[in-house]
A protein has these predicted regions:
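Short, gly/Ser/Thr-rich active-site loops of penicillin-recognizing serine hydrolases
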Residues: 294-313
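Active-site helix/loop module of the DD-peptidase/beta-lactamase fold
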Residues: 54-96, 161-198, 202
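Short, charged, amphipathic alpha-helices and their helix-cap/turn boundaries
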Residues: 19-22, 65, 99-140, 165-184
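A short, well-structured edge-of-sheet supersecondary motif
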Residues: 1-29, 272-274, 279-283
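Active-site Gly/Thr loop motif
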Residues: 181-185, 232-284, 289
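Active-site-proximal alpha-helical segments within enzyme catalytic domains
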Residues: 150-158, 198-219, 270-287
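Solvent-exposed loop and edge beta-strand segments that line ligand/cofactor-binding
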Residues: 138-147, 195-201, 264, 270
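Active-site SXXK
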Residues: 18, 35-60, 83, 155-159, ...
Length: 313
């Protein structure tokens, strides 16, 4: 009640299997109203890359440069697996308290923020990312993950290069696999390329249905695989340590995990958790109203609440 009573709360929903267990909405928000899920969108990359890996079209150990010859030094020698795990050190930074952070320049290139000068394409921006100052390679020597939304766009370009079809077709199939009640909305860059790094918008109920695809270990509502069961099991078991206040979690294949559940947060106050063992999925949507739109201390209580709900009992 404390979290759903916050002034920036939008919506919360919980499902178990195909049953709606709980939902709550702010006075100015409706059950049929889509909400930006921001970086929870990244979980779609797990499903798509996992399917391509299981089909033998992607080797997680190959370098990004082997798949995308046009990529720059910031990703050329990084492996697909390291990009999935946010285990790449390069010249891209994502510090929301810094108005000049690379992430905001990335938003301008992808059409999510008004540019101050020219209008570079998202692909050109990604291609121009170089090594970190003074670095000779992209090896992450920090001991924890290095969060970069550009990583997800790189994976999206990899998926389109190896998938043999437009990325938008994958998202149409994802909407079907989730069995969305409304629609799966996704922002695109100026060239029409979907933004998996943070462009999806869903209702609270449909966000749970989206998460449940991962909770079913890749199966759609019709029982057909959209993601990959072995890839998601490896996701639960693997990953790179996250720093405090999420030190008990790992970043694994475009998800957060503690080995029991899979989840992800979104800029501005969103979080999603799905528990494959209990079949429960819970989503929390809000819009933080502070200077940067981000507060690391805001998420732990939400994560703890959703994890407890999804544990059942």
């Amino acid at each position: 009640r404390r979290l759903t009573g916050l002034p920036w709360f939008s919506a919360m929903a919980v499902i178990e299997g195909n049953r709606l267990v709980y939902e709550s909405y702010a006075a100015d928000f409706r059950a049929d109203q889509p909400h930006s899920i921001m970086s929870i969108s990244k979980m779609s990359a797990n499903l798509i890359i996992g399917r391509l890996w299981e089909e033998g079209r992607i080797d997680l150990g190959e370098t990004i440069g082997a798949v995308l010859p046009w990529i720059g030094a910031g990703y050329r020698e990084a492996t697909v697996q390291d990009v999935l795990n946010m285990n790449v050190k390069n010249g891209y930074d994502e510090d929301y308290s810094n108005p000049d952070t690379t992430a905001f320049l990335h938003e301008a290139a992808s059409g999510m923020r008004l540019p101050t000068g020219g209008e570079p394409s998202n692909r050109d921006f990604i291609a121009a990312i170089g090594l970190a100052p003074g670095a000779k390679d992209t090896v992450n020597d920090t001991g924890t993950y290095l969060y970069k939304s550009a990583n997800t766009d790189v994976l999206a370009f990899v998926a389109e290069a190896r998938g043999g079809r437009a990325l938008g077709q994958w998202l149409a199939d994802l909407a079907d696999a989730a069995g969305v009640e409304g629609a799966l909305h996704v922002a695109t860059d100026r060239q029409g390329f979907p933004l998996l790094n943070g462009g999806i918008c869903l209702t609270a109920r449909d966000l749970c249905r989206y998460g449940a695809v991962l909770g079913r270990l890749g199966l759609g509502v019709d029982g057909r695989p959209f993601g990959s069961d072995p890839f998601l099991r490896a996701t639960l078991a693997g990953g790179i340590s996250m720093p405090p206040p999420r030190g008990h979690l790992r970043y694994s294949n475009q998800t957060n995990t503690n080995g029991v559940w899979l989840g992800h947060g979104g800029y501005g106050g969103q979080y999603l958790i799905t528990n494959p063992k209990t079949g429960r999925t819970a989503a929390f949507l809000s819009v933080l109203q502070d200077t940067s739109g981000y507060d690391p201390s805001y998420y732990p209580p939400i994560i703890a609440m959703l994890a407890e709900i999804c544990a059942g009992g």
